């Protein structure tokens, strides 16, 4: 059995006027993830919004925050060969994130190699093989705000990897003008999810919403008519947001999820969300 740890929407160090203690929440998640699987994870994927690019915070402090998150995450791996893959979110400083990752994660391949078909794709792609699965991580530069994934990235995904064994990760979910709704507070149409995802993968993972959700979709319009796909939205570490409340109420309870599968090709993928319901906001007085 292989175990992948997905961490998302950490916003490390930001307190949003005292509403959150994101450093303490991160520490709580690290402890929980260690307890959940003491032997460590075969891979770790951090899907964005790691450190806020706050203009009131110095770049040196941002570097320290990224380094803290990356070094803590490295300690959650099964061994030193287990990959740690990260992608920027909309709140990250891409340059500082990349600088620190190059320092702390020397084995992490940034940039797109022409031999992998990613020349001029407009963003970055990271990938790693874990058992029978290929983990593909696309940053926001490869996702068009209205049309989903860019044509070139789509071409590579369709031709490079067997989609039955591809686990695709992004920060923001695939979106178009009808599909994407902030914090999922409006109807998310499963058929549209399926039509966007099915050409590339049957198991898709994202963050951004700070809201645990799984969308099971059957395609109706794509050439893969009748194919079942799943979109898994990871709980946020900073908070969970109730998309159905009047003002999208944010609850300072951290969460994450563990993805498991067997060695064999085409093996089923299982997602185990963890919400720290017993988390108590740290008293700062």
Per-region residue spans from a language model:
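N-terminal active-site segment of His-dependent metallophosphoesterases
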Residues: 1-67, 161-162, 285
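Metal-dependent phosphoester/phosphodiester hydrolase catalytic core
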Residues: 2-15, 37-42, 85, 122-184
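Short catalytic/ligand-binding loop motif for oxyanion handling, primarily in non-cytosolic enzymes
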Residues: 14, 52-55, 93-97, 144-145, ...
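Extended active-site neighborhood of metal-dependent phosphoesterases/phosphodiesterases
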Residues: 59-155, 192, 200, 220-235, ...
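Active-site-proximal segments of metal-dependent phosphoesterases and phosphodiesterases across multiple
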Residues: 59-66, 161-201, 209
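A short C-terminal boundary segment appended to hydrolase-like catalytic domains
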Residues: 248-285
